[in-house]
Amino acid sequence: MWQNQNTVGYAEVDRLYIDYNANDVQVTVGRQRIAWGTSWVWNSTDLFNPLSILDFDYEELPGNDALRVQYYTGAVSKIEFALAPDRKKNKLTSAALISYNAFDYDFNFIAGIKNNRWITGFSWVGDIQGAGFRGEVTIQEKPERLSEYELLYSQFELQPISYSNKNLFSFVLSGDYTFPNSFYIHTEVLYNNIGKEENTALFSLEAKEIGLLSPSRFSVYQEFSYNISPLTRASAFGIYNPGDKSFVIVPSINYSVITNLDLYLISLIFDGKKFTQYGDYGTSFIARIKYSF
């Protein structure tokens, strides 16, 4: 809407779609959210709307201009197909999902095309003794060589990620538990077989272009939160890159001032050496007041 040296104003249409239902079939056309992932930080099976845990101010979550057809084969099972063009990159994402429940777990199997390359995988969500247990696994066709990154990497005697000549394998494992006193703990790990362990920040743009959730080989997420009072919740999470030893820590406090009015205080603390994944962003402190109506 506007932008100057001190302020930025913007507007976003998050959802605008037509929804049609006929017996066990549901057809949705327009801007919608297609959330196939089961993990809460990294979603390798979420082909249409992957999340960014650091985008804390986008609570509505991103949508996609897509066609979605769902056929419900039972109370907790379905077959789904979705198609979404990317007008900016002249690419198409299309995929099918089969979802069913067994042994008190929900299982999803996917197969499709993303970034003009085939991708397949599966995910699950359930619990072990009251603790949430989730995971996602994907295998994707190796990317084309992105030679436009050669000049940048040659200064550091490095090669683009896309030159690895390997199919992409991604694995996410997640667990969480809430104690009776409201104390919450959540741990999640991500593995990318072609991710980097050094100079990770240099590979961020290329990693995003070829579909990696992170340019690093390993990533570890840890979160703790607790209700200080009925109106106040404190939380802190961190992401650590074991390869380059960089990290980000994000403490926050959410306070309900009055009905429908919330005060949110958050800080993003990045640390690491130059060219590490989280080493070049410094520290930010943010206050947000939100009124809901």
Tell what function each PLM region has.
Residues G9-D14, N21, L61-D65, N90-S94, ...:
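Residues that define the transmembrane beta-barrel architecture of outer-membrane proteins
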Residues Y226, Y255, L261-D262, I266-I269, ...:
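Outer-membrane beta-barrel "beta-signal"
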Residues V125-I239:
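Detector for outer-membrane/organellar transmembrane beta-barrel domains
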Residues D24-V27, V76-I79, D104-F109, G130-R134, ...:
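Repeated loop/turn-to-beta-strand initiation elements of outer-membrane beta-barrel proteins
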Residues M1-K78, G272:
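Outer membrane beta-barrel
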Residues D19-A22, Y71-T73, S99-A102, I113, ...:
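Residue-level signature of outer-membrane beta-barrel architecture
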Residues V29-R31, F81-P85, F109-I113, G135-I139, ...:
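Transmembrane beta-barrel strands of outer-membrane/channel proteins
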